[in-house]
Amino acid sequence: MTAILSRVTGSVLLCLLWAWPPTSLLAEELPVQEVIVSAAASLTNAFTELGESYERDNPGHRVILNFGGSGQLLQQINRGAPVDVFATADQETMNRAQNRNLIVPESRVDFARNTLVLIAPSDSMLEVVNLEQLRASAISRIAISNPASVPVGRYSRLALETAGLWQDLAPRFINTQHVRQSLDYVSRGEVDVGFVYATDARAMQKRVKVVMDIPTTVPIAYPIAVTSDSRNSEIARRFIEFVGSLKGQAILSEHGFGTP
């Protein structure tokens, strides 16, 4: 009797298994909710990890990341690019977005801080104690992001203007489209020094070294907001909440960012 019951039970179970689709197929059939995040290039490493952590905590959600210069990203949004979350490396760019009604004002919040540094290739013998030393003949190529569209370029320009060096050093500038391009140029030894954020130098500390911390007249604060044309504003808000959560802030801290 037991053997017969066992065979019947086994047959029924086998039929149920055949009738029930595999878990992987069920997961594939669930609708995936995407959130598209356009973020400043200096956030590349931190936001990549943040996105992965958010996805693990929110099954069925997918974070699509787009990095670039803050001004360039603003232009993309202004031209209708599908973006749900916008994160910049300065207040000025976010102010422009808000003035053009491209973001939801009440969703805007600062989530991180950074500092400006001057870097050189790790094997460089240069020693720079103050910006005036950038006049030295040994420094002929200086990587600096375009101030017209990149926040780190504006911070760098302001520091050089304050020191009375902007015009004199201009012939030595190698303009870049974003901070990671400046970092790349320095790491490959294609320029003598470059202006980047401390977090960028940290991300490539085996290939570049910080030769000077650059004081700025305004804090380097990072704002984030939901875009006005977001196709998934609820998920966008959840992602922003995650960035500001204890877990999100811990990830940012691991990458060298300060608290807002």
Identify the meaning behind each predicted range.
Residues 9-24:
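Bacterial N-terminal signal peptides
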Residues 27-58, 62-67, 71-81, 88-91, ...:
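Exported/periplasmic ABC-transporter solute-binding proteins
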Residues 1-5:
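N-terminal secretory signal peptides that target proteins for export/translocation
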Residues 7-10, 128:
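Low-complexity, intrinsically disordered regions enriched in charged/polar residues
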